[in-house]
């Protein structure tokens, strides 16, 4: 094998220190990859595989493969690799190759991983990108989360047998892109499987040394200060060790200033409502169950934010509903103030529009990857602050007043950027052209030389003619001698002694002077020098801005919160929501409640509102019967979403709501076979029910849909009844429960089970047709309407006829008389339903926006409904 070149030896040494990363090795204007990295990158990035070895006598397999990307376009390629879960180590030239003596010095400047991405093009504007650190031992667990793009950091810890489940639930809040695991965490299959299957999260297995407590305490003290360390529980170091492991990983991979990560949010159980992954999925808080899309989720309805940071703030509220009645009241009070003052609210929203992402801007500035455009964007945002401050100051609400006080106008920072950076800077700070004219005299002088090099020469030529009296003197240029002074032979006796002869021609002599040599050097190097000087000035300006980083972060946080509050207010007004009363009563009372998402998805029909009452003692458990497709699941989800909305401080889709704080919401809705885990529908269902009964408390809200349907009728009914009795029994659980079932026999429990009450979904039948009225009414359903639903689904008529015959035979065998549907059957007073629909439409009608003709058409439509 041929001896390696010095450059390849250097490459292999650096690669040896970064074996788990794809190494981007800087060579001139390209980042090159070699050997296995080249093969992998060429496949993932569709790059042509070549080789530096041009020896025609070597077989292709003996040549080291190579591929590369232009350095100025590398961000897009790095982003593609990181999005696929790879680590990318960026190896940069640490000195100017033109000035290097021998081999150019190179070193890793950062390692980009899924959890450490800060490039704006690689991130979703309204979603955070978290790196998490998890520590786990036989007694305790800790979970730390950090978004490198904004600097926010969160930390929590757990003890006891359920510590792993709690950590997984926290992962559901943050949806990390990458996890750094302690040895104990890496061995916990429940955790690693959740990271892989539920979050598609890259896992970095750390050593015990990375998570050591002494090192963790040192890192926390350095990064967040002594006070932050003192706030952590001394008796449970797991949280500190999780954060220490995360910080260790950041220091190893980032190799830059991380001082903007300066505020630690430590929280314990009891501060936020805890939601497991099943509840988050079934309630479709941030993405739909099937398409994994934002549209159709609760976030889609509530998010009318005007800034990326406001969108992230609102999303975090949805992920972390509050448990403190006081905190909820303060937030909903701010929303109410915004709802009540239409003009000020709309002016605030207009002022926030297009503000930009100050949180991520200051992150990139401190991190060192910001360009001139980032500084210009920050300046533009700062210029909007006085207007936003004035709008916020017009509200008397306590929460909004606090945000106003938190809003630093940053006039000094904005003025400094405005003075230094031009209005439309180029993309790269390495090419110059972004320092404003007049900011620095030396930059101005060099630019003058660049723009008017010939003019400078002409000025010198005129000056020399006047000084020497040589009328034919001229200054010229050629590639051999550079600039020169040419004097005809008739005047060579007048040449000053300071002129140095350089060349003799037939009719003239050519000279140079020290001044001309200096000027030539300035002209030839002006471009390089002005670019270098501009970068120095940019670096100095960046350091000035970094000194104000915490002020900028506080202001950005206030803006994000104001934006999120304004969004909730705008949605409340537009959708006709009410402010809920939130207390610790244990009561859930909702009048004319609506599903926040379904009502926005309906186009041609009105959503039918429903009432809900669940008391601390009475009506704790609602047994809901009715045909499939009638709306049972929608109703139950509706109640859960209204409770959750109330606990994030939002208004809710109802005419009145009183919500006793709920500590957890559990859902068992629908089921699908988990074939990959070898689990059937029924096994999945029973596992989820077991988890719910093990973790629920009397303060929880349970949404249980069709328990027991995955097995035989009597087994299923027995399990359903036992679960229902367990939920209702205050000595065992006593949780508020919405229990939908197709076992009509369970309706008899209303008479024997304390706190149980029957409800059903009203339907109307005409002949063999069925109409769902979507109305929840007291009492149990008298039949299932299964064949009528099958008809709606489009089963062939022959199948339906045969089904009716079989049903009649089965019911006769069991001593049940078959009663075909009457020609017209109402389970409830239809006029009451129609009146409810009309009243709901009237409440939501924006009369000021209606034309006379539109109003008349509405009246005709309402009259038609009431006459049916």
Task: Give names to the regions the model predicted.
Residues 371-374, 847-868:
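Short, amphipathic C-terminal "tail helix"
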Residues 91, 114-123, 257, 393-399, ...:
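Active-site phosphate-binding and catalytic loops of NTP-dependent enzymes
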Residues 38-55, 146-174, 493-524, 604-614, ...:
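Extended active-site and interfacial segments that coordinate phosphate-rich ligands
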Residues 1-337, 353-366, 370-462:
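Charged catalytic and DNA/RNA-contacting regions of genome-maintenance
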Residues 140, 208-221, 273-277, 289, ...:
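Amphipathic heptad-repeat alpha-helical coiled-coil/stalk segments that mediate oligomerization
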